Each structure stands twice: as structure tokens, then as C-alpha cells.
Regions:
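Alpha-solenoid helical repeat scaffolds
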Residues: 25-29, 63-67, 97
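TPR/TPR-like (Sel1-like) alpha-helical repeat modules
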Residues: 84-106
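Short coil turns that delineate tetratricopeptide repeat
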Residues: 35-37, 70, 103-104
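Helix-turn-helix repeat elements of alpha-solenoid scaffolds
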Residues: 13-26, 50-62
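Catalytic domains that recognize anionic headgroups
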Residues: 2-13, 101-694
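"A position-specific structural signal for the A-helix of alpha-solenoid helical repeats
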Residues: 6-10, 40, 44, 78, ...
Length: 694
């Protein structure tokens, strides 16, 4: 849009000269009309209002821009300036921290407002969104100086936003059948050690539960004739609680240091701690079933399962899972929106693409907008107890997992043997309530070979030529080559996953009838290790092997014995569960209800890479063809891209990017081009930049 482009750079020139006069307002009005959805107009308006000494108005405009582009330096700068002038030092420090981290700006200054809550917010601003409850740079005031050091949020609240009316996450360690305080002792000793953050944390389990901290006495009301399960978190080894009920003499309960225990209460109960140590009291879990709910809704994310690779061998490679879902619906043409987990998980949990969640960069610090309701929030509103007995922490700091009552996390190791065992224990413990549960399992996810211990059956069966290879650089999983050792590790992990998940599914069949449960098994993306490529060639990170995903369902309302050939996307799980479970899905989500459930078939699915610093890549697929697009220049940090001169081609499915196979027909262009333009329009930046480009 050449007209909007010229207006932008005219406004930028005036802004840099400080020419905030009536002509500036005329040009700004023209720019708003030319680009009504651009956040850049709000940034110019904020700059104007700052020049007119109206920081409150500037903050409003800046917030609008920030909500649309949470990684915009220009939005951070106007908000930092506005809040400084308003006297909101803590708010200003948050935006100054963003600029400090990403643009080498000035470090946030220490101020009298730096209380515990402000320091927690500042800590979040100085860190990315992975690895909760760990933090590489925790803010503290030492000798009136603001400092940052590695730490872990444990025995305290996690500084993340939760839904209105909900307790915050109080962080404990997960005892996992051992002694209550053992992991509390360990984490107290290593919480500030780099070696723990960089390595040993990978399989360390944390237990995050919605709870509030109490000192002294608390009374738990139990409705007459009902029972509740009460989570309790301790802060000291063998912490004593006096338990008082109307029908029994006083008794003692013992808690562990930073560890949760549970009590079943059948009448109103008073808990008393006579020392000064606080303890955490979770929200009581009211037992009982409702005919409006299912007894179990279970989502199983088998990370990085490429369905097109597995599908021809499904019954052979995954016999237990195949047998279970033969009585449900399997989607054969299912695609991820993204090539890796960080943007894909929010897409699944919200039914929205990454440019709508604004969760595409794990180094960012912001959270999912509160008006975007997650699956767990919706299920909680229906009355389910929501829990993830095993999950990565990828969606914790960014708000994707905020609707869960309980999260048991580990930063890296999420084996199905552990996850399915925890799931069965979870159902046994809390199954008198209606449950919504999520398992995130990593058995088949590929990892860089340089430091990885492969399965024994992989190491002992491969000949040396395949077991050993020259690979001298650390490589992201989405770019791993097609080495035989990676494929063998995948098969070994797949066998583990089928055996362990199969045991869980058999348990569910024995415990519930089909109209009492809904089980979904799916993946968030595929895998690059099945894509041959010449040495030195760039991988196709949004090719079918990397974005073809699994999705299968069984249970109440799910058609039996169906293998659906319609196109589906990972954003479609959200409206499907809305349909089956009875919660309202927002009208502006990107997901759609599949035809097999009474919806309309998609005419296309979209997979894309919007990783800042790399070119934007789009694969728009129908059943027979694919449009492939790649920009000339990288995606900006704020998630926008310049589509001028982008490379575009239309190919037969199965021959994407193959030389000599591009097609150029009028009907194909008429179908693909308008849809592709509509898809990228919201984040096309029209080459309008507040700062010069290299």
C-alpha cells in the first residue's frame, strides 16, 4: 500500500523532528483511514500525546498498540515514558526491561515501589516464557541496587495471571511417592546454581496448584452430605497441623517442605498451625458427578508424532492405540499450524493461530490476553476439576495453562511410562469428581544427538556406520537431519508410548462406559528426521513431514469406526470439544468444527513459520495442491513481515518446492491467492519500520 507507506514515513519524519502540530494530526487521521488496523497509528498518537503532556492518554494508546503487537519496541518505549510521567515506576520498569533485554536499552532503575509484587513482575519481564517455575534472572534489591540472579519460584506464588476469582499457582515440588521434604531440601540448596538451571532441572518435577497461603487458622466449609478433597502445601519439614472436626477429637496432620498432600473432608473442618510457618490451602475439590458433564475428558499430546510417517504402519507400530481408537474417529489429513511446540500448544488450547495469540517467540515475557479463553478455563467453568499430571512448562508463564487447577511439570523429560502412571493415580484419587486432564508426552520427540543418551535397543542394534556420525554443531530439533539413529530412536519411543498409553486406555475402558468419557490423542507437529535432504541444504521446516500431525478421538458423541479424510487443523480441537462438552466457543476463533461432527469441511489448512529472524513461510494446503510462500526478508521481532517480492508457488501435494513441478493455472491462482492475502494481511507490515533496517 504505497499511500499508507508514504503517510507512515511522513509521520515518522515529523515525529523525529518533534513536529507535533495540527498538520501532524491531519496526517495521522489520513493514516488511520488508510491503515485502520495498524497499531502504528496508536504509537504515533501516543507520541503526540506525550508531546502534549498527556501521559494518561498516551498510555491508553500505547496499551492498544501493545495488545496488538506485544513485541513492539515502539510500543514499549511510549508505555515506559507514559508510566514514568504518571508516577507508575513499577509499570515503567516492566517496559524498560523489555527494551533492556531486546534493544540494549537502559536497565530499569531501582525505586521505592520495588516491593515483592513489583520485583516479581520485573522478574517476569526480564525472562522468557520457558521453564516455569525456573527463572534465570530474578530481580532483587541489594544495597539499594537492582540485581538479577538465577532462582526458582518455590514455596511461593508464581507470578502469572490467573482467571478472575481463581487462586494463584502456589509452587511446590512433586514428591512422587517418596518422602515429602526430600525434593524441598534439594531445591533449597540448588535453586541459585547455574548447573541446575542448565542441566539437572530437566527431570525435576514441580507441583503447581491453585492455592492461597495461610498463617494460623483456616476453616474449610463442606456442604452437608458432600465430601471434598483439600490440597495442602507445607513450608517446613514435618510441619504440624491440628485438624478439628465436629465429630472427632483433634488430630495431627504432617506436611512436607514445599510439597503437597491431600485430605478428604466430609464435614466442615478447622486447620490450625501453631507456629509462624505459613502453609498453602488449595481450592477444595467438591466430589460428585453431574449428568451435564462427562466423568473423564482426557487430552493426550504425543509431541512431534508425524502422522503421515506413522499412518501406513499404524496397526503394526501402535497396535494398542490403534485398537482403542478403531472405535472412534481418526483424522487422516490433519495439520499443525507451526513446526514446533511453543506456538502450537497455544493454538491447540485456544483454537487460534499464533498471530492471534501473539505467542510465537519463547523469549517474550507477555501472557495470553485475558479475553482469550483456554480449553481448561472453559472446562473449569463447566465444573470440571482440571489438571495436567505431566506437562512441559512451555505454556505456564505465557498463560496457556492458566485454567488448570494443578500442573505437574518438568522442563524436558516427559516419558509416557511416568505420565500414564500418574494419570491412573490421578483418576483413582480424584475420579469421584468430573475430570478434565491433559498429558504432554515426549517419547517420540527428536533431540540433538550430541549429548543425548539413546535407548539401549537403539545403541546396541545399529551398525557403527549409523550409530556414530560426524555432527559438530548443536541443532534445533526442527532442523535435525534424517540420520538412521534418529529414526531408530523414534521407533523405540513410539513402542514405549504405545505400550504405556495402551495400558492407560485399557484402564479407561474397564473403568468407564463409552458415554462417560472423551479421549483425544494428538500431536502438535511432525518431525524433520524423516525428510531426506542433501548435505548443506536447508530443511523444509513446514513440509508435510514437519507439520502433518495426528488426531484421533473416542467416546461420548464421537462417531465410531470413522477414518475421516477431510482437512483438519490443530486449532479445530477447541471447537470440537466445545461441541462435545457444551461450552460456547467464541465466534472469532480460527478453528472450525469438522464435518464429521456436523460442521463444514475446510477447503484449506494453514501451516506457517513466523520465527523472528527467519523468513516467514506459509504452506496453504488443499487435498490436492499446496501454495508455498516465503518472504525475502526475516520476520520482525514483533511478528510482522514484509511480503513485497515474496516467492510464491503452487504445487501438487507431495511435490512441494520440487523443481519443475510448480503449476500456474488461472483457477488455482483464483483459489489460493485471495485466501493467502487474507491470511497474512493482519501481520503484513508494509515495510513500515520505526527503526532503520540493516
Amino acid at each position: 500500500d504505497e499511500y499508507a507507506y508514504k503517510l507512515f514515513y511522513d509521520l515518522l519524519d515529523r515525529s523525529e523532528r518533534g513536529a507535533y502540530d495540527d498538520d501532524f494530526l491531519v496526517q495521522l487521521a489520513a493514516y488511520r483511514e488508510a491503515a485502520p488496523d495498524s497499531e502504528r497509528a496508536d504509537i504515533f498518537a501516543a507520541r503526540y500525546l506525550l508531546a502534549q503532556n498527556d501521559p494518561a492518554g498516551a498510555a491508553l494508546c500505547g496499551e492498544r498498540a501493545f495488545r496488538r503487537r506485544t513485541m513492539s519496541t515502539a510500543a514499549w518505549n511510549v508505555l515506559a515514558a507514559a508510566h514514568r510521567r504518571l508516577g507508575n515506576a513499577a509499570d515503567a520498569a516492566v517496559f524498560e526491561s523489555y527494551a533492556y533485554r531486546f534493544d540494549h536499552g537502559q536497565a530499569p532503575a531501582c525505586s521505592p515501589e520495588m516491593n515483592a509484587a513489583a520485583l516479581a513482575r520485573l522478574t517476569r519481564a526480564m525472562n522468557g516464557c520457558l521453564d516455569a517455575p525456573l527463572t534465570k534472572r530474578r530481580a532483587a534489591v541489594e544495597n539499594n541496587t537492582l540485581t538479577f540472579h538465577p532462582d526458582v519460584f518455590v514455596g511461593e506464588y508464581l507470578p502469572v495471571t490467573v482467571p478472575d476469582g481463581s487462586d494463584r499457582f502456589w509452587v511446590g515440588t512433586y514428591a512422587d511417592g517418596g518422602f515429602l521434604s526430600d525434593r524441598g531440601y534439594m531445591i533449597a540448596d540448588v535453586r541459585a546454581k547455574d548447573w541446575f538451571h542448565d542441566n539437572i532441572c530437566r527431570d525435576f518435577p514441580f507441583d503447581l496448584q491453585k492455592a492461597h497461603e495461610v498463617k494460623g487458622t483456616v476453616q474449610i466449609e463442606v456442604p452437608e452430605g458432600r465430601a471434598v478433597i483439600l490440597p495442602l502445601g507445607g513450608t517446613a519439614p514435618l510441619q504440624e497441623l491440628i485438624v478439628q472436626t465436629p465429630s472427632h477429637d483433634d488430630q495431627l496432620a504432617y506436611l512436607g517442605k514445599w510439597s503437597y498432600s491431600h485430605l478428604r473432608l466430609c464435614e466442615t473442618t478447622t486447620l490450625i498451625c501453631e507456629d509462624d510457618a505459613p502453609f498453602a490451602v488449595g481450592a477444595p475439590i467438591l466430589l460428585g458427578h453431574s449428568p451435564a458433564r462427562k466423568k473423564l475428558v482426557l487430552n493426550i499430546l504425543l509431541d512431534a508424532l508425524p502422522w503421515n510417517v506413522v499412518r501406513p504402519h499404524f496397526a503394526e507400530w501402535m497396535p494398542n492405540i490403534a485398537r482403542f481408537f478403531a472405535r472412534g474417529t481418526i483424522f487422516d489429513e490433519h495439520f499443525s499450524t507451526s513446526e514446533y511446540t511453543y506456538p502450537a500448544l497455544p493454538a491447540i488450547e485456544t483454537g487460534r493461530y499464533a498471530h492471534h495469540t501473539q505467542l510465537f517467540c519463547a523469549e517474550s515475557s507477555h501472557e495470553l490476553a485475558p479475553e482469550i479463553l483456554t480449553l481448561a478455563e472453559c472446562m473449569k467453568d463447566l465444573g470440571y476439576h482440571t489438571a495436567a499430571p505431566i506437562t512441559s512448562p512451555d505454556g505456564v508463564y505465557n498463560g496457556t495453562m492458566r485454567g488448570y487447577d494443578r500442573l505437574i511439570t518438568a522442563t524436558w523429560q516427559l516419558p509416557s511410562l511416568l505420565g500414564t502412571s500418574r494419570a491412573i493415580h490421578h483418576i483413582e484419587a480424584f475420579g469421584e469428581a468430573d475430570l478434565f486432564a491433559f498429558l504432554h508426552l515426549s517419547d517420540v520427540h527428536p533431540w540433538d544427538a550430541m549429548g543425548l543418551h539413546f535407548a539401549a535397543e537403539v545403541e546396541t542394534r545399529l551398525p557403527l556406520a549409523q550409530r556414530l556420525f560426524a555432527w559438530e554443531k548443536a541443532t534445533a530439533s526442527v532442523r535435525l537431519p534424517d540420520f538412521e539413529i534418529y529414526k531408530a530412536q523414534f521407533r523405540a519411543g513410539l513402542s514405549d508410548a504405545d505400550r504405556n498409553i495402551g495400558a492407560l486406555l485399557s484402564y479407561i475402558e474397564r473403568r468407564y462406559s463409552d458415554d462417560e468419557f472423551i479421549v483425544s490423542l494428538y500431536s502438535d507437529h511432525g518431525s524433520s528426521v524423516f525428510t531426506p535432504r542433501p548435505e548443506g541444504a536447508e530443511p523444509d521446516i513446514i513440509g508435510e513431514n514437519s507439520t502433518r500431525a495426528a488426531w484421533m478421538m473416542r467416546g461420548a458423541g464421537v462417531p465410531e469406526g470413522v477414518v475421516a479424510q477431510e482437512l483438519t487443523s490443530i486449532v479445530d480441537l477447541y471447537p470440537t470439544l466445545a461441541h462435545l462438552c457444551g461450552f460456547p466457543a467464541a465466534s472469532d476463533i480460527d478453528g472450525s468444527l469438522p464435518a464429521v461432527f456436523g460442521g463444514r469441511e475446510r477447503d484449506a489448512v494453514y501451516s506457517f513459520c513466523m520465527y523472528p529472524g527467519q523468513t516467514y513461510k506459509l504452506a496453504m494446503r488443499t487435498k490436492t495442491h499446496a501454495l508455498r510462500l516465503e518472504t525475502r526478508t526475516p520476520v520482525e521481532r514483533d511478528g510482522t513481515a514484509d511480503f513485497a517480492g515474496a516467492q510464491v508457488g503452487i504445487y501438487p501435494r507431495g511435490h512441494e518446492l520440487t523443481e519443475g513441478r510448480a503449476l500456474d493455472g488461472r483457477e488455482l491462482r483464483a483459489f489460493f491467492y485471495p485466501r493467502a492475502r487474507d491470511f497474512v494481511r493482519e501481520f503484513a507490515n508494509n515495510a513500515e519500520f520505526f527503526a532503520p533496517r540493516d
